[in-house]
């Protein structure tokens, strides 16, 4: 199995980097198993060659997984069952660890706080930073000893080492862009990289499926997960309905503003600024017989001071596009000075403010440094639709992740950023 994998990736060059080295024969190899085909294949790659391969399953949530259908089986129970089936097939031991409290405090509560303030946070980035590559590492350090194990996950990203210079380890995009998850890993601690193995990032999804079938894995045909499991299994998978159970209603007006007079017109009500995101289609009734109001309307701005949501007509309305953003508290994935030096050549830099987004070219950027923080004002080469405060913006130099941080301000006019 491992030889088959190495033969596949051996044909793929990534100069000036070399792939992460393999463990020694009797090293501890710990595979974070989620029950999906990707982590199952990751486990299979090592289980046959390294006798000290073990699995670990993280349970980070145990609230009712179907708030409108309490009789439905929680997703974590199904996942744990599938993990055990794979572990039995591979003849490896698997531990189950519970990080519900950590997830709630470090990921879920900050997410709720962000939504209540009208921003759009990304809990997956926080989960990777604080739980999967934070709390799990602490647990593994205590169990196996710091530096005495390798951590393997099924993420679509790559850990590569510089062939020259300092020999630093870096996080790179997956070779298979349709599944790339480097955006979600952009805030993990760089000290993790030297003992982190991401074998799936060197493969395409069809290759992963083929390897799963070759190994006879019970999860070979399991569909890919879509988003947050406890949201998909509740309230028909509608995130807005899910949030209603945790955020108080804070009704306000949905308005338009006349571009000439500045006069406001109210067209409906919202449950709270958290109930809509920038760029989202608004399903309210507009007078379609009037040419001025025909068409589809979208959220262009959340007005926190007045608790109003401003809408505009047309998916490509200019008001939905911005060319300037500010990132506060940028977190470098590597030495801080190394990241700062990379900003000297903005022509090589791109960014993503969504996962799987086509990389966005940067026109210029301005760094504001302090002892503790790195704030960046970025001017884009072209305007982008629905850049939203609270989103994480990840910066890249070629395919290498420099780091990321939350977007604090967005502006159409780059002179007022």
Curated annotation (Swiss-Prot):
GO terms for cellular component: mitochondrial matrix; mitochondrion. CDD domains: MnmA_TRMU-like. The keyword Metal-binding does not apply. It is found in: Mitochondrion. Residues 122-124 are annotated as: Interaction with target base in tRNA. Its EC number is 2.8.1.14. It is an enzyme of class 2 (transferase). ATP binds at residues 32-39, 58, 154. The record marks 155, 281, 391 as: Interaction with tRNA. Residues 179-181, 354-355 are annotated as: Interaction with tRNA. This is Mitochondrial tRNA-specific 2-thiouridylase 1. It comes from Saccharomyces cerevisiae (strain ATCC 204508 / S288c) (Baker's yeast). Its main location: mitochondrion. One of its GO terms (molecular function) is sulfurtransferase activity. One of its GO terms (biological process) is tRNA wobble position uridine thiolation. Disulfide bonds join 127-229. Gene3D superfamilies: Adenine nucleotide alpha hydrolases-like domains, HUPs, Translation factors. Keywords: ATP-binding, Disulfide bond, Mitochondrion, Nucleotide-binding, RNA-binding, Transferase, tRNA processing, tRNA-binding. Signal peptide: none annotated. The gene is SLM3.
